């Protein structure tokens, strides 16, 4: 079995259907003996240019290991699903399990917001104070 990295974009009106779509694709891959190594739901994001009159799309990233038969079935599912605006399938040499840069940015933002929420109280204005010398 080979390793693949897959990104697909779902029409924003169908964002509620993304978890069911992921489960359907997971079933297709695992029924053929494949494995998921990474699954990231990046949520709605702005597109660089409109696709089918949509300016936003729901992004999903998957790193999988599957046979060519399961991959062909998955690609057909993407092609015939009108909710999938675009998809990209890349062959990888090995399984990628580390978080993507978008997922890392999101966790960094969450950690920073938690730190500021814990440290609320008197704001520290020492950096804003001007030093006056006579």
Swiss-Prot record:
Top-rank lineage group of the source organism: Bacteria
Database matches in Pfam families: Ribosomal_S6 (PF01250)
Q: Which keywords does UniProt give here?
A: Ribonucleoprotein, Ribosomal protein, RNA-binding, rRNA-binding
Q: Which InterPro entries match?
A: Ribosomal_bS6 (IPR000529), Ribosomal_bS6_CS (IPR020815), Ribosomal_bS6_sf (IPR035980), Ribosomal_S6_plastid/chlpt (IPR020814), Transl_elong_EF1B/ribsomal_bS6 (IPR014717)
- Sequence segments annotated as region (Disordered): 100-134
Q: Would you kindly state one Gene Ontology biological process term found in this protein's UniProt entry?
A: translation
Q: Name one GO cellular component term.
A: cytosolic small ribosomal subunit
Which segments of the protein form a coiled coil according to its record?
A: none
Transmembrane intervals: none
| Record has Heme as a keyword | no
Which ranges are annotated Basic and acidic residues under compositional bias? 103-115
One GO molecular-function entry: structural constituent of ribosome
Question: Which NCBIfam families does UniProt cross-reference here?
Answer: S6
Q: Which family does it belong to?
A: Belongs to the bacterial ribosomal protein bS6 family.
Quote the function comment for this protein: Binds together with bS18 to 16S ribosomal RNA.
Q: What is this protein called?
A: Small ribosomal subunit protein bS6
Q: Which organism is it from?
A: Acidithiobacillus ferrooxidans (strain ATCC 23270 / DSM 14882 / CIP 104768 / NCIMB 8455)
Q: Which gene encodes it?
A: rpsF
């Amino acid at each position: 079995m080979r390793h693949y990295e897959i990104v697909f974009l779902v029409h924003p009106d169908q964002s509620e259907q993304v978890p069911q779509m992921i489960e359907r694709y997971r079933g297709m891959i695992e029924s053929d003996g494949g494995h998921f190594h990474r699954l990231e739901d990046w949520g709605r994001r702005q597109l660089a240019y409109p696709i089918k009159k949509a300016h936003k799309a729901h992004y999903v990233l998957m790193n999988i290991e599957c046979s060519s038969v399961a991959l062909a079935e998955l690609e057909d599912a993407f092609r015939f699903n009108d909710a999938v605006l675009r998809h990209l399938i890349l062959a990888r040499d090995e399984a990628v399990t580390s978080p993507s840069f978008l997922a890392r940015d999101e966790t960094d933002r969450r950690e920073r917001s938690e730190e500021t929420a814990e440290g609320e109280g008197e704001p520290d204005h020492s950096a804003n104070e001007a030093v006056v010398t006579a």
